[in-house]
């Protein structure tokens, strides 16, 4: 009989990994068998070179370029980690010209970014007030509808299970282009609006179908299931698509808009625990485009304008 597979190393994040205390913490964690995500301002800076020279670093240490005020970069560093050691904080040696921006904001806001960066799971719900105030009616409707399911199920002793997907992409079976596919076509064809460089949480439509059947067939399934296995920034997605399909116009993206905004990863661990195995994001994007190429949806039509679906209007960059 084959020996059992070794358990994966516990994974943690250390912010400010190149600092005095953090460096020793990284060294200790590596010696105890941890896989470490260390954030540094510049992984190529020689002042951080000592980290990759630590015992075990080649196998178990990953450096992430991240400032404590860049919540999107922090989210990427924290993704997949069981815990976070928030050590990063400015320690000025000289007289401070602007204490508020040089010390207070990085220390306090940076800490808040870490706390708010806790991955969102099934315990988290969309905020009704935020949805209503920003006229995000679809999200509001889905939130209220799901709350209604749970209220009804509790009162009537109904065995209910809900699956909550994010942006759904992938090839279609129906001929009419659906709303989320319109978003992808808008990105590729190059609509008139500039998009924010925000994170997109994406799931393949085929994986959503798998998830729905999985929770139905598994007797142990219960409660809510987040269905959001992948995320990518708008800028990174454009770079990925342009390399493979360089002949399209593509929408413009306002770089670095996501910096200092609250970006929190969404996790689908509960669904994965049931045996759900979603596709890689690259497969979803490429299969989506190949479908639209074959069906002619990517062909330019004279006089046709490409609109951003209203449900995604918050993806649009504000006019300066």
Residue ranges and their predicted role:
Residues 2-36:
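N-terminal Rossmann NAD(P)H-binding glycine-rich loop of SDR-like oxidoreductase domains
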Residues 3-4, 184-193, 198-225:
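Alpha-helical substrate-binding/gating segment
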Residues 90-93, 118-136, 173, 188:
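Active-site "gating" loop of Rossmann-like NAD(P)-dependent oxidoreductase/epimerase domains
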Residues 125, 129-161:
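Active-site Tyr-X1-5-Lys
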Residues 155-158, 170-183, 215-225:
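Glycine/proline-rich active-site loop of Rossmann-fold NAD(P)-dependent oxidoreductases
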Residues 211-261, 289-292, 296-320:
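Mid/C-terminal beta-alpha module of Rossmann-like enzyme folds, strongest
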Residues 239, 257-277:
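Conserved C-terminal active-site "lid" loop/helix of NAD(P)H-dependent oxidoreductases
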